[in-house]
Amino acid sequence: MARFTPLLMILLALVPLYYSLDCRKFSFAPACRGIMLKRSGGHPMIAEQQPMIDNAKAREVQMMELLIRNIEDEALIANSDCVSMSWLRDRLVNAKNEMPQ
């Protein structure tokens, strides 16, 4: 029994440290892993990227509307029911290259 007394004392000294572990400071400690993930909510990086994605989608819709209007105007000017595929392809490529970053 005397052999295990130091081991038991060390174990009893470490138990309060385990329960007093600050999970805000050591979020990846095995005892804190589940707690901090449940409390954190959404990741801030995702919240920052969502408006950028929405803005990109809005710009894409505006660009497509502008291209459709330009194609319709060019078709009316040319008095033609069809627009050539090469002209349409060139127009789309040029519009994509001119799009502000």
Curated annotation (Swiss-Prot):
Record's keyword terms, sorted: Chemotaxis, Pheromone response, Secreted, Signal
Phenotype of null mutants: Suppresses the olfactory plasticity defect in nep-2 mutants, which are defective in the plasticity of chemotaxis to benzaldehyde. Double mutants of snet-1 and daf-22 suppress the daf-22 mutant olfactory plasticity-defective phenotype to levels similar to wild-type.
Cellular compartments annotated: Secreted; Perikaryon
Main location, first listed in the record: secreted
Modification comment: May be degraded by the nep-2 peptidase.
Example GO biological process: chemotaxis
The keyword Metal-binding is annotated on this UniProt entry: no
Tissue-specificity statement: Expressed in coelomocytes, the ASK sensory neurons and interneurons AIB, AIM and PVQ.
Signal sequence residues: 1-20
Listed GO CC annotations: extracellular region; perikaryon
Function, in words: Negatively regulates chemotaxis and olfactory plasticity which is the change from positive chemotaxis to dispersal after prolonged exposure to an odorant. May be down-regulated in response to pheromone exposure, resulting in promotion of olfactory plasticity.
Protein name: Protein snet-1
Species the sequence originates in: Caenorhabditis elegans
Annotated gene: snet-1
